[in-house]
Amino acid sequence: MVVGVVFGLLALTFTGLVLVGALIKSSRDSVSVSPVAIPTFTPPERSTERPTERPGDGRSDEPEPRTSQPSAEPSENSQPRRTLNTSLKNNSLYANRGLPRVNCPAGSGSIYNHSQLKSLILKTSRCMDKVWSKTLQDRGITWHRPGYAITSRRGRGACGDFPQTGSIVPYYCPRNTTIYASTTAMARGSGNALGYGQITDWHGAIISMMAHEYGHHVQQLSGLSNTWWQQTLESGSRSGKLALSRRFELQATCFGGMFMRAAAASYPVTPARRNTLYYFYSRVGDHPGWPRDHGSPANNNRWFRQGYEKNKTFQCNTWLAPSSTTS
């Protein structure tokens, strides 16, 4: 989830509007349900700067420290730096062979236990580091680990409250490249918003959502997010801005699918659990009456499966896909 885009009144100061999707009523349900969100991303306040402020005002966990890998100064014998393509359709990120397998056993933690779920989120984040750092650095893209602020209830970070009122979603804040999440909100819900546990209590679903958030970090590092945001600012219509948002979010979902495939053998994601993930992504997406900013449940399922089954970044190029697949 990206926090701070107000599509009705697009602002240069990004007040926190959490973009939500929905839990679609199944045929066996006889009552309507409240939206269940799929995560999104918050655009940077300035595309060329990363503010140094730390998230939190004492109510949230401090973000887990990041480890950076500074670029070495070029020497006489070093290879010239690559010229990176930061466009949406031909980004340098797309020229890779996919994510390598990673040893990432999850264990049997419960999504309803804060300590267990937080531990699993941070453990699997290290697995995401391993596969994405190699993929990015192989393309000449500078990588650093995102920060994490995981609470049991609510907190406040550099992009505002998390989760926001009436929301359950984790989000990525590019102002300090930190991922924020409330374990209780994600698992059990908040207010009228149902938790992911209403769909499945298997922890792999929430970890796949955190992989979506990491996908936003990948978009940030590769220049995709800045290019997307510039095009959003230049778009002259609400429908145009929403169309860009859907492609952006569905791409992050595809990247999340890539990670789950990379970890599948060790996590493990059995064929039955794979089907659980497919079912999960067929139940989240844009809900009637809410902004069409994340894509339909059918297309969320489509792009998660695309990432999981193809495991190639160019296969996640939503910017070249037909509009029918990003609606």
Regions found by a protein language model. Name each.
Residues 236-264:
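Post-HExxH zinc-binding segment in Zn-dependent metallohydrolases
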Residues 283-327:
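Pan-zinc metallopeptidase signature
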Residues 19-111, 238-239:
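N-terminal low-complexity, Pro/Thr-rich disordered segments
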Residues 220-246:
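Post-HEXXH active-site segment of zinc metalloproteases
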Residues 1-11:
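N-terminal export and membrane-targeting signals
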Residues 132, 181, 208-223, 252-253:
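Active-site recognition of the HExxH zinc-binding catalytic motif
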Residues 190-209, 242-244:
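Short pre-active-site segment immediately N-terminal to the catalytic Zn-binding motif
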